[in-house]
Amino acid sequence: MVMRNVRKPYPAMSDGGLGRGSTAQEYDPSARIMVKVVQGSIYGTKDRLPNGKPYYCFKGIPYAKAPVGKLRFASPVPIEKYAVSYLDCSRERSSCLGRDVITREITGSEDGLFLNVYTPGLGRVDQPADTLLPVMVFFHGGGMTGGNGDSGMYLPDYLVQEGVVVATVNYRLGVLGFLCLPQAGIEGNAGLKDQ
């Protein structure tokens, strides 16, 4: 992964590069951080920890094609390349369709296969190239019927402050994640395969 600060502005994208109906946002290079991943370039934000140190947030990173239409009950299909040159990963996206663990209301969207990454450093820019950081991947609870990995409920601050890279993952829930009908070609356990 190549990481660097971006110093020049790029045009706003009508859908955040997802082809999924997100709204356009102005690109502010002073507040956003650009990184390169296998699928293309993404930009996130720089924030401050309670101790005043900076950390970097990349939210709403799609890790599989939207599980809609023919992919609704299928195993996750990796994204080979993003649809735009620079993907906006500065905000959390929709969680997978399920029940809110607190209000019990139905929330989210079928298109919810996103992850969030919070890191105290950006590799070669902030640390020696041979420095590796511990990584914690968090899969939310909720009985496979509700919940999400958004930072509003599970704050990554303490772990990031201790030098840990934190990744939170949304996965398919309920019937969309765990329906099994072999005779209809639905293998089942898509929610576990998302993980």
Region spans (language model):
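Non-catalytic accessory segments of hydrolases
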Residues: 2-5, 9-193
